[in-house]
């Protein structure tokens, strides 16, 4: 499902201003990814911004959740509305390819970098258990738990790119950027489509509403 189809579907819906702005922003970044064909760094970043536009909610001081917990809660809500099992089908079809490659890539496993920086003493045992858990969650159709692992890896990759931890178009991290892009380009349109269908769900307020002056 491309940005053109999503935009057409959005125009056909009557949504609240808050929800319409959220989805319009998310679709615009999918369009950006499509326009930058062949530029994996920019495409992945654009798709992450699109994803971020979907799950970003209003932050309320000290009661705000961490970003990781916030998008886990968001994904759990999406899965409830995924009556066609699109998330599971995506993970099942892609597990032998980009999903498995990403999950088993130590360079997008946050504790590996914490160990490298001397912040923790060990990372290999937890990494092995995480990989084993991913296989188990797939076999038991625990979609939310598997997505949490995948998104955790993607979040680490996002941090590397957004915080200057990687060289643009570098050969060093091509495999994880390519796998991340191949997952996000399929995952994000599903998220937007579900949010569009279940527009009466409370998806929260957007962080930066349009201010009329």
What are these regions, as identified by a protein language model?
Residues 28-32, 45-56, 153:
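Short, hydrophobic/amphipathic alpha-helical patches that form generic packing surfaces
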Residues 37, 62-65, 168-174:
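Short, surface-exposed loop/turn segments at secondary-structure junctions
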Residues 39-43:
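Helix-start/N-cap signature of alpha-helical segments
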């Amino acid at each position: 499902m491309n940005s053109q189809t999503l935009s057409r579907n959005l125009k056909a819906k009557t949504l609240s201003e808050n929800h319409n702005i959220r989805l319009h922003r998310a679709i615009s970044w999918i369009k950006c990814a499509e326009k930058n064909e062949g530029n994996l760094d920019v495409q992945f970043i654009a798709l992450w911004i699109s994803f971020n536009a979907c799950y970003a909610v209003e932050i309320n001081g000290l009661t705000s959740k961490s970003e990781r917990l916030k998008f886990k809660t968001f994904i759990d809500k999406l899965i409830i509305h995924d009556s066609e099992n699109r998330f599971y089908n995506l993970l099942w079809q892609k597990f032998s390819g980009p999903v498995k490659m990403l999950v088993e890539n130590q360079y997008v496993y946050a504790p590996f970098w914490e160990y490298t920086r001397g912040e923790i003493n060990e990372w290999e045992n937890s990494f092995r258990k995480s990989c084993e858990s991913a296989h188990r969650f797939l076999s038991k159709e625990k979609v939310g738990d598997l997505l949490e692992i995948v998104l955790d890896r993607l979040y680490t990759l996002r941090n590397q790119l957004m915080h200057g931890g990687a060289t643009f178009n570098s050969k060093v991290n091509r495999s994880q950027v390519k796998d991340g892009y191949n997952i996000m380009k399929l995952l994000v349109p599903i998220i937007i489509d579900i949010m569009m269908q279940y527009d009466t769900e409370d998806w929260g307020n957007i962080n930066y509403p349009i201010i009329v002056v």
